[in-house]
Amino acid sequence: MIKLSNITKVFQQGARTIQALNNVSLHVPAGQIYGVIGASGAGKSTLIRCVNLLERPTEGSVMVGGQELTTLSESELTKARRQIGMIFQHFNLLSSRTVFGNVALPLELDNTPKEEIKRRVTELLDLVGLGDKHDSYPANLSGGQKQRVAIARALASNPKVLLCDEATSALDPATTRSILELLKDINRRLGLTILLITHEMDVVKRICDCVAVISNGELIEQDTVSEVFSHPKTPLAQKFIQSTLHLDIPEDYQARLKASPETDSVPMLRMEFTGQSVDAPLLSETARRFNVNNNIISAQMDYAGGVKFGIMLTEMHGTQEETQAAIAWLQDHHVKVEVLGYV
């Protein structure tokens, strides 16, 4: 549905040249939810704006629904953009218009008959859970409700593609979850192709089928969500995955934690499990093989793309030789082990 080929975007600021995107290629199949994740300034907003030519690429090809957009005339591009809805971090609603009026606006601009506008807007407001807010104004809505209005407006022209530019960044966690569930529901009901950009791996984990990691204007990793979470290939992908697992060292352990081993101290380990290593009884196996005992301090497990992954803090009790051998064995079995110190 979306195919970007060798996209390069260069901005000129006086004598200064800024390369925002460098030879980026991305394919989003029809009906998928595809996430692009990156830090601020990585180029993700520029990338998504190239899809509907809000930013015209310096080089490269933009195909949406089998149509090459970069060669279209202005009138042809305007028509093609009706198939591409877009929502933003800031809702961009017209304060002087009711909820109904905001959603109706693109239909009015397209000279849609009034009866059809009424039918379509009512249908969309029911879809996004705002069937009782027809006559409300944006000032009387919560942030989540405003984004729901923006989603309804973006769907007014029956687009095949929805672009989401940091659509949940301004929302609290609970509202973010509800908006993501709405997008997932719309994707399932309408078969809508969704391309979203974000700096939060929690967003990707919750609804995306595939994910690409962008850094300094280049896509450095892209695959299914389950594959990236199970076998991240780049340090940046690993960092984003770690950010979804929030496991702090308890205060009493922090007070006792030493950088070097002392008499009778034991190593404190941080272990990360992905894929098959999550379900395998690896800790009990190390106890049998190496005569070590693991005291689990805290642990957390989650799912992404149908794959389980988890993190654990433990004390490993045993001789230095046995604990080193046990750690090496765990690493051989796809567990990432970090010695945080000694307690």
From Swiss-Prot:
Q: Which InterPro entries match?
A: AAA+_ATPase, ABC_MetN_proteobac, ABC_transporter-like_ATP-bd, ABC_transporter-like_CS, ACT-like_dom_sf, MetN_ABC, MetN_ABC_transporter-like, NIL_domain
Identification of the protein by name? Methionine import ATP-binding protein MetN 1
Tell me which residues bind ATP.
Answer: 38-45
EC number(s) for this protein?
7.4.2.11
Q: Where does this one sit in the cell?
A: Cell inner membrane
Which gene produces this protein?
Answer: metN1
Q: Identify the species of origin.
A: Salmonella paratyphi A (strain ATCC 9150 / SARB42)
Q: Known PANTHER family for this protein?
A: AMINO ACID IMPORT ATP-BINDING PROTEIN, METHIONINE IMPORT ATP-BINDING PROTEIN METN
| Class of this enzyme | translocase
- Listed GO molecular functions? ABC-type D-methionine transporter activity; ATP binding; ATP hydrolysis activity
Alphabetical GO CC annotations of the entry are:
Gram-negative-bacterium-type cell wall; plasma membrane
Please report the stretch or stretches of sequence annotated as the ABC transporter domain. Answer: 2-241
Q: Into which family does the record put it?
A: Belongs to the ABC transporter superfamily. Methionine importer (TC 3.A.1.24) family.
Keyword annotations of the record: Amino-acid transport, ATP-binding, Cell inner membrane, Cell membrane, Membrane, Nucleotide-binding, Translocase, Transport
Judging by the UniProt lineage, the source's domain of life is: Bacteria
Q: Which SMART domains match?
A: AAA, NIL
Catalysed reactions listed for this entry: L-methionine(out) + ATP + H2O = L-methionine(in) + ADP + phosphate + H(+); D-methionine(out) + ATP + H2O = D-methionine(in) + ADP + phosphate + H(+)
Upper classification of the organism: Bacteria, Pseudomonadati, Pseudomonadota, Gammaproteobacteria, Enterobacterales
Its function, per the record, reads:
Part of the ABC transporter complex MetNIQ involved in methionine import. Responsible for energy coupling to the transport system.
- Keyword DNA damage applies: no
Primary location: membrane
